[in-house]
């Protein structure tokens, strides 16, 4: 009897030493007897264009993308799903059966789900919502809040220019 194919996955970012993703993913892989491992992939800024195409050659099934690469990674995959395209950022790459790379973004879904888990009757249109930061994850959160009917989203960021750019991108003056 042959064992199931080995699954190699990881998280690309800079830095990634603090990431809890490997501990979480490896726990579930082991708990359910899945043949795989999830590793940290520290990729410095400027090296992303080399790292992402290397996923296929190294036998990865996919990876997650974290700071500071969520926006830049969009240009480095073969296909981007519609949600990630609209959000302007991605956090997941899946190596397809044909070897092509497809990018996704599930940050917004996860954020909305965490709100609903904590407060099942939460509604996006109930009042103003503040978003702290304007990086790749914030883009997904703003998109998801707007999709759920948020009427007023206040962006708070260290630099006003980045907050203004994100607001403008999503249709606010």
Task: List the predicted regions and their residue ranges.
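Phosphate/diphosphate ligand-binding glycine-rich loop within oxidoreductases
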Residues: 3-120
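Conserved N-terminal Rossmann-fold NAD(P) cofactor-binding segment
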Residues: 160-173
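Short beta->alpha hinge that forms the Motif I/post-I loop of the SAM-binding pocket
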Residues: 43, 158-159
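Glycine-rich adenosine-cofactor-binding loop
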Residues: 13, 103-108, 115, 122-150, ...
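Alpha-helical structural signal in soluble globular domains
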Residues: 72, 76-79, 144, 148, ...
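Generic structural signal for residues in well-ordered beta-strands
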Residues: 38, 153, 172-173
């Amino acid at each position: 009897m042959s064992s199931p194919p080995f699954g190699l996955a990881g998280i690309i970012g800079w830095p990634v030493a603090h990431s809890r993703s490997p501990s979480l993913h490896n726990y579930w892989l082991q708990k359910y007897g899945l043949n795989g491992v999830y590793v940290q992939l520290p990729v410095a800024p400027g090296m992303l264009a080399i790292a992402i195409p290397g996923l296929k050659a190294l036998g990865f099934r996919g990876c997650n993308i974290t700071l500071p690469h969520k926006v830049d990674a969009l240009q480095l995959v073969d296909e981007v799903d519609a949600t990630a395209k609209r959000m302007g950022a991605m956090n997941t790459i899946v190596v397809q059966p044909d070897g092509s790379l497809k990018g996704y973004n599930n940050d917004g879904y996860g954020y909305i789900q965490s709100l609903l888990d904590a407060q099942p009757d939460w509604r996006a249109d109930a009042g103003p919502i503040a978003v702290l930061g304007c990086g790749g994850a914030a883009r997904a959160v703003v998109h998801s809040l707007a999709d759920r009917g948020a009427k007023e989203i206040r962006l708070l960021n260290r630099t006003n220019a980045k907050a203004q750019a994100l607001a403008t991108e999503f249709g606010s003056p």
